Swiss-Prot record:
Protein name from the UniProt record: Akirin-1B
Family that this chain belongs to: Belongs to the akirin family.
Motif (SYVS motif): 180-183
Region ranges (Disordered): 14-43
Places the protein is found: Nucleus
PANTHER family xrefs: AKIRIN-1, AKIRIN-RELATED
Length: 183
C-alpha cells in the first residue's frame, strides 16, 4: 500500500521565510473575519469560470471619475454620520430641528455668511484623511479577497494532482490484482 510520511524541518530552513526570500508567504486572515470557515477558506473550489478570471491587479486601476465618485459616496456617508451624531446630541440638549430650520431659512443668499461658505474648501484635511483611509481599506479588502481566492484555486489544483498521482502509483504497483486486507 502507498504510504506517505513527512518529517519536520529543522531550524536551519527558517532562512527561507526571511524577508529576502523569494518565496511568498500566505496572507493572514483579516482580524474581523468570521470564526467559521467560509467555502473559500475550506479549499472548496469557487464557481468561477476560467475565462472570467483576470490577473491580479488587472482591473484595479481607478479612473479619475471612479475616484471622484468614491469620494462623493464616502463624503455622503460621512455627512449622514455627522447628521446622526448631531441629531442625537441635539435631542439630548433639547434643541428642536424646527427652530434650526426656521433660523437657517432667515439668512439671505447675499449675506456675508453665505460668502464665507463659498470660500471654504469642500473637505477639511481631516475629512480627506478619513475618506482616503476608507477607500484604501475597501481596496485592500478587495485585493485580499482576490488573493485568497487565487490561493484556494491553486491549492485545489495541487490537491487534485496529488490525488491523481497517488491513484496512479497505487494502480502501477498493484495493477489489476484484487485488494485484500492481508499484505
Amino acid at each position: 500500500m502507498a504510504c506517505g510520511a513527512t518529517l519536520k524541518r529543522s531550524m536551519e530552513f527558517e532562512a527561507l521565510m526571511s524577508p529576502q526570500s523569494p518565496k511568498r508567504r500566505r496572507c493572514a486572515p483579516l482580524p474581523g473575519s468570521p470564526a467559521t470557515p467560509s467555502p473559500q477558506r475550506c479549499g472548496i473550489r469557487p464557481e468561477i469560470q476560467q475565462g472570467q478570471q483576470q490577473p491580479l491587479g488587472g482591473d484595479l486601476r481607478l479612473t479619475p471619475e471612479q475616484i471622484l465618485q468614491n469620494i462623493k459616496q464616502e463624503y455622503t456617508r460621512y455627512q449622514r454620520r455627522r447628521q446622526l451624531e448631531g441629531a442625537f446630541n441635539q435631542g439630548e440638549a433639547g434643541v428642536s430641528n424646527e427652530v434650526q430650520a426656521s433660523c437657517s431659512s432667515l439668512t439671505a443668499p447675499s449675506s456675508p455668511g453665505s460668502l464665507v461658505k463659498k470660500d471654504q474648501p469642500t473637505f477639511s484635511l481631516r475629512q480627506v484623511g478619513i475618506l482616503c483611509e476608507r477607500l484604501l481599506k475597501d481596496h485592500e479588502d478587495k485585493i485580499r479577497e482576490e488573493y485568497e481566492q487565487i490561493l484556494n484555486i491553486k491549492l485545489a489544483e495541487q490537491y487534485e494532482s496529488f490525488v491523481k498521482f497517488t491513484h496512479d502509483q497505487i494502480m502501477r504497483r498493484y495493477g489489476a490484482r484484487p485488494t485484500s486486507y492481508v499484505s
